[in-house]
Amino acid sequence: MKIGITGAEGTIGSVLRKGLSNKYKISSFTLKNQDFESIQMDLSNNNEIQGKFEGLDALIHLAADPRPEASWESVKKNNIEATFNVYNEVKKAGVKKIIFASTNHTQHGDTLLTTPETLDLQKSKILSLENNTNPDSLYAVSKLFGEDLGKYFSEQYKIKFIGLRIGWIVKEDDPTVMCGTPSEDYLRSMYLSHRDCIQVFERALESSRNYLIAYAISNNSRKVFDLKETSRALNFNPEDNSENYFMNMK
């Protein structure tokens, strides 16, 4: 299978380029020149992406402004206009599947403490995919747009679509990097390890579902997302738990 990865220079992109390379032929798409082979283009510029996805079987769309505090101007350009351009080019190129990097922030609006990367433990509760969305930022709003646009392209153009509401993956692959900070509780809940990240994207690539929204977090003791439906739909069985890292600190 030939797959493309937009935003291949980011943390998740770097994990997937390495973790999926033994099984898939990967084309990397980046905004700027990198120290690895990639095709440079601005996804918000429709002219730059024309023809770039030809020959792909699936596209993993990671590229975005990932900051919860991102301005509307940036969100509109990098997360909304770019995502439409990507999906539209996927359609033109005959790509059969989109894996979209959505976010946990789509359901975090009433449980943040002070900022989108904090968690109010008094309001924390187990949420499922059946619960209403509650975006905590314009960034999260843009990801809901990506999910809904994916539904449109799935229904109207028969492109398979899986949106992964991703937790928090850190470059160090160790949630204790936030120990003692205001974001510690949030990361303990939302942690996604590198190997669990690779597994959930691989399961998404292998899935035959026409349209699916799923969670992408590790099996954390403090998780706030119910993984049962995701595990059933994708055969995703995360191996890691953020609490194990903190226990090893003692």
Positions of predicted regions on the chain:
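Rossmann-fold cofactor-recognition segment
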Residues: 31-45
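NAD(P)H-binding glycine-rich loop region in Rossmannoid oxidoreductase-like domains
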Residues: 41-78
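Substrate-positioning beta->alpha
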Residues: 141, 162-166, 180-203
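Conserved beta-loop-beta element that borders a ligand/cofactor-binding pocket
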Residues: 147-171
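Conserved C-terminal active-site "lid" loop/helix of NAD(P)H-dependent oxidoreductases
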Residues: 178-179, 213-237
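Conserved Rossmann-fold NAD(P)-dependent oxidoreductase catalytic core, especially the SDR/UDP-sugar
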Residues: 87-136
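Active-site helix of classical SDR
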Residues: 138-145
